[in-house]
Amino acid sequence: MLMITSFANPRVAQAFVDYMATQGVILTIQQHHQSDVWLADESQAERVRAELARFLENPADPRYLAASWQSGHTGSGLHYRRFPFIATLRERAGPVTWLIMIACILVFVVMSIVGAQSVMVWLAWPFDPSLKFEFWRYFTHAFMHFSLMHILFNLLWWWYIGGAVEKRLGSGKLIVITVISALLSGYVQQKFSGPWFGGLSGVVYALMGYAWLRGERDPQSGIYLQRGLIAFALIWIVAGWFDVFGMSMANGAHIAGLAVGLAMAFADTVNARKRT
C-alpha cells in the first residue's frame, strides 16, 4: 500500500477516488485527521500522481462530478460533516500554526492601539549595536504587520501551508522551518532596507518553496504545493522587485525565504531519493 495524498475535505477525496475508479485504478480512503488516499497496486503510482496533478489544477471539472455519478459511490459510507469556518481552521491547523497566528494577531492589535513605532522599538530587528544580544528580535519581526491586507494575506498562506506541514510532518519540522527562515530572511532584508520591516512573508515563502520541492522529490511525504501556486509566488516576487503594484514589499525577505525553503526540502529529500 502506498499513500498518494491527503485531503482536508472528504468530498474532494471521494471525487478523485471515484474518477480513478472509472480509469481502472482502485484507490481507498482512510479517515484520520484528514482523508488519506491509498493505492494498493504500487506499479500504477506514476499514473495516479499524474492524474492527481491534473485533478488539483481543477477539481471542479465536470468530468470528476460525472465520475462520481458513474461510479455509483454516493453512498460510500463516508460520513461528511459541514464544517463551520472556525472548525475548518481548527481541522487543518496544529498547535504551532495556531500559536503563530495568535501571536501575529495580538501584535497587530497592539500596533493598531499604541502605534507601529511603539511596538517596533521592542520587536524589530536590532537597530542599534547595543541591541544585538536581544535575541528575540531576530525572529519577532515576523509577527509585525502593517495593514489588514498584509496580515490576512500572510496568515492565510501560513495556515494553508504551515498547517499542512505540521499535520503531516509534525510540529518540530514547522518550528525548524519557521525559525531558520525568519532568521535568514530577516538578515537579508535588513541588508536591503535597514531594520524597520516586518511580516511573516519570509517564512511563508520558505514554506512555499519547501512544500513544492518536497512534493516534487518525495510525493510519499504527503506534502505538496501545486505548480500553479509556486508560479504565482515567483510572479509576485518579480512584481515586487520591479515595483509593479507601487507597494513597499520585503523583496529580500521573499527571495531569501524561498531559497531557505528550497534548500531545506532538498536536504530532507536526499535520503528519500536514494531509497527510490
Swiss-Prot record:
One of its GO terms (biological process) is proteolysis. Gene3D superfamilies: 3.30.70.2350, Rhomboid-like. One of its GO terms (molecular function) is serine-type endopeptidase activity. InterPro entries: GlpG_N_sf (IPR038236), Peptidase_S54_GlpG_N (IPR022732), Peptidase_S54_rhomboid_dom (IPR022764), Rhomboid-like_sf (IPR035952), Rhomboid_protease_GlpG (IPR023662). It comes from Citrobacter koseri (strain ATCC BAA-895 / CDC 4225-83 / SGSC4696). SUPFAM superfamilies: Rhomboid-like. PANTHER family: RHOMBOID PROTEASE GLPG, RHOMBOID-RELATED PROTEIN. It is found in: Cell inner membrane. Its EC number is 3.4.21.105. HAMAP family: Rhomboid_GlpG. Its main location: membrane. It is an enzyme of class 3 (hydrolase). Keywords: Cell inner membrane, Cell membrane, Hydrolase, Membrane, Protease, Serine protease, Transmembrane, Transmembrane helix. It is a multi-pass membrane protein. The keyword GTP-binding does not apply. The active site is at 201 (nucleophile), 254. It catalyses: Cleaves type-1 transmembrane domains using a catalytic dyad composed of serine and histidine that are contributed by different transmembrane domains. The gene is glpG. Belongs to the peptidase S54 family. GO terms for cellular component: plasma membrane. Rhomboid-type serine protease that catalyzes intramembrane proteolysis. This is Rhomboid protease GlpG. It holds the Pfam family Rhomboid_N. The chain crosses the membrane at residues 96-116, 142-162, 169-189, 192-212, 229-249, 250-270.
